């Protein structure tokens, strides 16, 4: 993560990349900082030598980035709001899913992982980085320095790839529904694999973390063996892996799913069950698209800030650059608090869960309908009920003649005719139907509860 300009950290450059979500400090630009302390101002910036005394320049820059108390108080409130909403909101989401059997679906297990990642980043990363950025002083010791540089990349990786797993799962459920869905065990394996890959990606941040005690100042930073260019390259790779690549995958999958679900009605699809499942699937996909778009918007300004300040190092001397950084970092961290709000607004079952969680509030009323939303299922899926679906393929309906019991008429006992579109897979009293379908609406083992 790009470092925030402060009185002691104004020269960021490519060395000030920091941890992807977490290290505000300049200490990532420790070489430049030490050069400045030694009086080598020009070499620190890579600028021509000036006649101005380094101590005078240092004092001017320090004054430039000193914030008034009222501004620090406002930023503290803004960051505190993010932490409070993100931690408590995501913990409630986890409780809603794990405490109610009806909520334990494949998609929701990935939402638990997403909520855990977001709550962890908010609790262990946001305020610590804000304090470090404002005071340019590391108060939290060597062990937490390593954790601070390591964990944010891990958590953001887990968050974005949980969303990616949901997108792929939705794609498989809607585009190729007859294939078996992920089991609970397979889902846990996927989640475990996500965290293992996240740990591997973030491990260099832990390995190269350092504490430097300066006169009157303690710094936490990442010192790469080959210097700032290696650090810059690493974080470009991180941006690609935790932002560009997963967003590309989700963009493609949700585009295909959206075309399928909103591409128009299928002729003859008038069954109530079909419309119920279609509506439920649309709601879930719409909710997840909003979650993904929110994440992308929140993190984009921060990544732009990082790239621009790394390439154009003179931007780090702009008098408003610290405010730009604090704003972009706040927006990135705020992505952790929006998901519970989105779930509550767009999903009636999560809304019922939040009502139960806040039932102690005098203005929150939990109705009997809200209780039923979390405790009952709409129907129990079976092989037979799942075939009671909509088919895009032509199927053959075998009609059994009422006179099939008459031996004299056994020769015309049954005949094959094209399926009546008006039947749409729904029950019909005059005949029994047997069809093999390839439905884009239902899989053989999926109920409406999976989507609504």
Swiss-Prot record:
GO biological process, one term: response to estradiol
Region (Disordered): 401-452
Lipidation (S-palmitoyl cysteine): 361
Protein name: Neuromedin-K receptor
Transmembrane segments: 72-94, 105-126, 147-168, 189-209, 233-257, 287-308, 322-346
Cytoplasmic side: 95-104, 169-188, 258-286, 347-452
Comp. bias regions, Low complexity: 433-452
Family: Belongs to the G-protein coupled receptor 1 family.
Keyword Transmembrane annotated: yes
Gene Ontology MF annotations: tachykinin receptor activity
Swiss-Prot/TrEMBL keywords: Cell membrane, Disulfide bond, G-protein coupled receptor, Glycoprotein, Lipoprotein, Membrane, Palmitate, Receptor, Transducer, Transmembrane, Transmembrane helix
Pfam family, one: 7tm_1
Role description: This is a receptor for the tachykinin neuropeptide neuromedin-K (neurokinin B). It is associated with G proteins that activate a phosphatidylinositol-calcium second messenger system.
Organism in which the protein naturally occurs: Mus musculus (Mouse)
Record's bilayer topology term: Multi-pass membrane protein
Entry keyword annotation includes Lipoprotein: yes
SMART domains registered for this protein in UniProt: 7TM_GPCR_Srsx
Modification after translation: The anchoring of this receptor to the plasma membrane is probably mediated by the palmitoylation of a cysteine residue.
Top-level taxon in the UniProt lineage: Eukaryota
Gene name, Swiss-Prot/TrEMBL: Tacr3
């Amino acid at each position: 993560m790009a470092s925030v300009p402060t009185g002691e950290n104004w020269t960021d450059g490519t060395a000030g990349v920091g941890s992807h979500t977490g290290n505000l400090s300049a200490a990532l630009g420790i070489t430049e900082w030490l050069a400045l302390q030694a009086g080598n101002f020009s070499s620190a910036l890579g600028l021509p030598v000036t006649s101005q005394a380094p101590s005078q320049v240092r004092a001017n820059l320090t004054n430039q980035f000193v914030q008034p108390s009222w501004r620090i108080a406002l930023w503290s409130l803004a960051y505190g709001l993010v932490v409070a909403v993100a931690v408590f909101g995501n913990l409630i989401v986890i409780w809603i899913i794990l405490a109610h059997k009806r909520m334990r679906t494949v998609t929701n297990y990935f939402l638990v992982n997403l909520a855990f990642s977001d709550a962890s980043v908010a609790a262990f990363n946001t305020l610590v980085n804000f304090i470090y950025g404002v005071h340019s002083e590391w108060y939290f010791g060597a062990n937490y320095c390593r954790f601070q540089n390591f964990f944010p990349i891990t958590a953001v990786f887990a968050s974005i790839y949980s969303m990616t797993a949901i997108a792929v799962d939705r794609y498989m459920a809607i585009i190729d529904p007859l294939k078996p869905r992920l089991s609970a065990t397979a889902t846990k394996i996927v989640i475990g694999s996500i965290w293992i890959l996240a740990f591997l990606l973030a491990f260099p941040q832990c390995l190269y973390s350092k504490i430097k005690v300066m006169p009157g100042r303690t710094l936490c930073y990442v010192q790469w063996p080959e210097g700032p260019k290696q650090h810059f390259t690493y974080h470009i790779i991180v941006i690609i892996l935790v932002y560009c690549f997963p967003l590309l995958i989700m963009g493609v999958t949700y585009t295909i799913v959206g075309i399928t679900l909103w591409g128009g009605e299928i002729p003859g699809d008038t069954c109530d069950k079909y419309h119920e499942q279609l509506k439920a699937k649309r709601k879930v996909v719409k909710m997840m698209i909003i979650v993904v778009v929110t994440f992308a918007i929140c993190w984009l300004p921060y990544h732009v800030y990082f790239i621009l300040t790394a390439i154009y190092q003179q931007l780090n001397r702009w008098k408003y650059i610290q405010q730009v950084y604090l704003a972009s970092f706040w927006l990135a961290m705020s992505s952790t608090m929006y998901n519970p709000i989105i779930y509550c607004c767009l999903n009636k079952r999560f809304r019922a869960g939040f009502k139960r969680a806040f039932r102690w509030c005098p203005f929150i009323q939990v109705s009997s309908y809200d209780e039923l939303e979390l405790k009952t299922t709409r129907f129990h899926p079976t092989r037979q009920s799942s075939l009671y679906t909509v088919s895009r393929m032509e199927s053959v309906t075998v009609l059994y003649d009422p006179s099939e019991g008459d031996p004299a008429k056994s020769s015309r006992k049954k005949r094959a005719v094209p399926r009546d579109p008006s039947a749409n897979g729904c029950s019909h009293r005059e005949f029994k139907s047997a069809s093999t379908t390839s439905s884009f609406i239902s899989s053989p083992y999926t109920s409406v509860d999976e989507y609504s």
